[in-house]
Amino acid sequence: MLLTISDFLFLSLTFSRYARMRDSRPWSDRKNNYSGPQFTYPPEKAPPEKLIKWNNEGSPIFEMPAEGGHIEP
C-alpha cells in the first residue's frame, strides 16, 4: 500500500504515539500528584483607567481621569 503525502500528513496529525501512553508509576506515586490545594488565589484587579457611562441611546461615554489618576469604580 502506497501512502501519499496527504495520507502521511493526515496520519501524523491525527495519531500521536504519546497520546495514550500508560503511566508506569505506581499508584502511591501518582496519588501524590493530586494531594494539596487544587486552587490558586485570584490576582489583584487592575484599577480602571476610565469611567464608562451610558447615555439614553445606549451608547457608552468614556471619561478619562484628570492628571493621570485612577478612577474609583
From Swiss-Prot:
It is found in: Secreted. Keywords: Antibiotic, Antimicrobial, Cytolysis, Fungicide, Hemolysis, Secreted, Signal. Residues 25-48 are annotated as: Disordered. One of its GO terms (cellular component) is extracellular region. Residues 1-14 form the signal peptide. It comes from the Eukaryota. The keyword Signal applies. One of its GO terms (biological process) is defense response to fungus. The keyword Signal applies. Displays antimicrobial activity against the Gram-positive bacterium S.aureus ATCC 2592, the Gram-negative bacteria E.coli ATCC 25922 and P.aeruginosa ATCC 27853, and the fungus C.albicans ATCC 2002. Displays stronger activity against P.aeruginosa and S.aureus than E.coli. Displays very weak hemolytic activity. This is Antimicrobial peptide lumbricin-PG. It comes from Metaphire guillelmi. The lineage of its organism: Eukaryota, Metazoa, Spiralia, Lophotrochozoa, Annelida.
